[in-house]
């Protein structure tokens, strides 16, 4: 395990301003920050990397980032920076971490792919399919310009007990999926092309690969991690039928034909609405990242109603638990309330 400490600078630093009384990019702030870097580099003397952030900020001092990179490098450490962030030329930074869809790897600068890897935004089941099947930065293998990938979980909210962060964000299954993909390379298409829907054809290579991964992962859950909060059960045997979306014109109480009979297709107001199969315990009708990541509907529209059904077999009469999850605007952020 390689620990990479990060001090985000000069952005995400309101606490620094409040505590020190100076903006990080000011002369006084830079002097204080260098003292903090002295302590950090001493504390983590055996670690080769230090991450300096540089994301989501307005730069007011053009000296700031180059001077901080040079200061840290002079202490024998290699420096990582977010991309998008400060713009570097080869040789000016040791590695970049691509944090958003706008982040692009640059020739001559090793990059870490993190663009679709924020598991606090993930559905427990659907995004695991996308994570496992996706190529790293849409490349089949690593290279001098592609160092690998990182999985992120932003735990901005105070969560007690802390183990709930691992459980609700499905850490271990996602960790195993990305670990195998980065170790072996390969994959099928990138997240923004493949999406999160498992192919229906059992002979499809992506279908077969995920079924095999799931089998091996559940073995590890049972034999290596039986006492860990491993929030996953088999989903490749779960089949749904989902209708085309009916226009409700904003009336969520409007009733459509599937409420009276379950059929392969329906005629409503002179138009035919079909239905299709889907596999998995979590199905995105529209992905949390919109049409950037494909979901069940190729062109999802507002003010529509969809119907989905499946069958559950039990060999005997019994009471069992139900695992029900809906989009929750990320388990990290406190903003983004639904429109009224």
Mark where each language-model region is.
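Aromatic-lined ligand-binding clefts that engage carbohydrates, nucleic acids, or primary amines
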Residues: 313-340
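Substrate-binding cleft of carbohydrate-active enzyme catalytic domains
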Residues: 1-75
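Flexible, acidic glycine-rich loops studded with aromatic residues
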Residues: 100-237
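C-terminal active-site-proximal or functional interface alpha/beta core segments in diverse enzymes
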Residues: 56-125
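Structural preference for beta-strand elements that scaffold enzyme active sites
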Residues: 2-4, 47-51, 78-80, 93-97, ...
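Accessory carbohydrate-binding/adhesion or oligomerization-edge regions at the termini
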Residues: 215-294
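Glycine-rich, histidine-containing beta strand-loop boundary motifs that form or position
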Residues: 5-9, 83, 115, 324
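Short beta-strands within extracellular/lumenal beta-sheet-rich domains
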Residues: 299-314
